[in-house]
Amino acid sequence: MGTRYFLVGFLILLVLGFEVQGAHVPQQDEASSPALLTQVQESLLGYWDTAKAAAQKLYKKTYLPAVDEKIRDIYSKSTAAVTTYAGIITDQVFSVLSGKD
């Protein structure tokens, strides 16, 4: 499972790297700096959209219903356990603060 996350991260960085190499912006005068800021912002948003689309495509390609079901089961069991122990700790704190034995 760790290999899959490594592969996803590697592919996202690879896509971003190729996008950055392909977008060469020539230098402009300082008078047009708001336009430059807008171009940089649009470029970054474009990179983000490209990376997001690539990650979603990879997720859809590698989606395993059995793994998703296991994750949901583990989440529900762990939240139930945390809720139980949080209730126990809360009761203990209240009993200590109230001073009743």
Curated annotation (Swiss-Prot):
UniProt entry keywords in alphabetical sequence: Chylomicron, Glycoprotein, HDL, LDL, Lipid degradation, Lipid metabolism, Lipid transport, Secreted, Sialic acid, Signal, Transport, VLDL
Q: Which Gene3D superfamilies match?
A: Apolipoprotein C-II (1.10.1440.10)
Chief location:
secreted
InterPro entries annotated for this entry? Apo-CII, ApoC-II_dom_sf
Entry PTM:
Proapolipoprotein C-II is synthesized as a sialic acid containing glycoprotein which is subsequently desialylated prior to its proteolytic processing. Proapolipoprotein C-II undergoes proteolytic cleavage of its N-terminal hexapeptide to generate apolipoprotein C-II. In bovine, proapolipoprotein C-II was found to be the minor form whereas apolipoprotein C-II was found to be the major form in plasma.
The biological processes this protein is annotated with in GO are: chylomicron remnant clearance; high-density lipoprotein particle clearance; lipid catabolic process; lipid transport; lipoprotein catabolic process; positive regulation of fatty acid biosynthetic process; positive regulation of triglyceride catabolic process; positive regulation of very-low-density lipoprotein particle remodeling
**Where does it localize?**
Secreted
Region ranges (Lipid binding): 66-74
Signal sequence, start to end: 1-22
One example of the protein's molecular function in GO is: phospholipase binding
GO CC, alphabetical: chylomicron; intermediate-density lipoprotein particle; low-density lipoprotein particle; spherical high-density lipoprotein particle; very-low-density lipoprotein particle
Report the family membership: Belongs to the apolipoprotein C2 family.
Protein's name according to its UniProt entry: Apolipoprotein C-II
Q: Which gene encodes it?
A: APOC2
